[in-house]
Amino acid sequence: MTDTTPNSAPEEPEITYEAARDELVEIVTRLESGGISLAETMTLWERGEKLADICQSWLNGARARIEAARSDAETAQP
């Protein structure tokens, strides 16, 4: 069975897809609203990149599981 947990840096706690997506939406909203310093913008952007990677890992894992299930179903049919 394939592990579907995202690969993250050791200091990053595991986070669900939904939590990562929700936090990413909040970050994008803050960045789009403006009025924050360059340093804070860069910090938010870096966090957003990490969250986007986590979301992509979850989606890749889900895609692999679906493809495996389809393959199993196709080989099981007479």
From Swiss-Prot:
Reactions that this protein is recorded to catalyse: Exonucleolytic cleavage in either 5'- to 3'- or 3'- to 5'-direction to yield nucleoside 5'-phosphates
Primary localization class, coarse: cytoplasm
Keywords, in A-Z order: Cytoplasm, Exonuclease, Hydrolase, Nuclease
Superkingdom, taxonomy of origin: Bacteria
EC top class named in words: hydrolase
Gene Ontology biological process terms in this record: DNA catabolic process
Gene3D superfamilies for the chain: Exonuclease VII, small subunit (1.10.287.1040)
GO molecular function, one term: exodeoxyribonuclease VII activity
Subcellular localization, as worded in the UniProt entry: Cytoplasm
EC number(s) per entry: 3.1.11.6
InterPro entries, A to Z: Exonuc_VII_S, Exonuc_VII_ssu_sf
Gene Ontology CC annotations of this record: cytosol; exodeoxyribonuclease VII complex
Family assignment from sequence similarity: Belongs to the XseB family.
Function: Bidirectionally degrades single-stranded DNA into large acid-insoluble oligonucleotides, which are then degraded further into small acid-soluble oligonucleotides.
Oligomer status and interactors: Heterooligomer composed of large and small subunits.
Name of the protein described by the UniProt record: Exodeoxyribonuclease 7 small subunit
Taxonomic path: Bacteria, Bacillati, Actinomycetota, Actinomycetes, Propionibacteriales
Gene for this chain: xseB
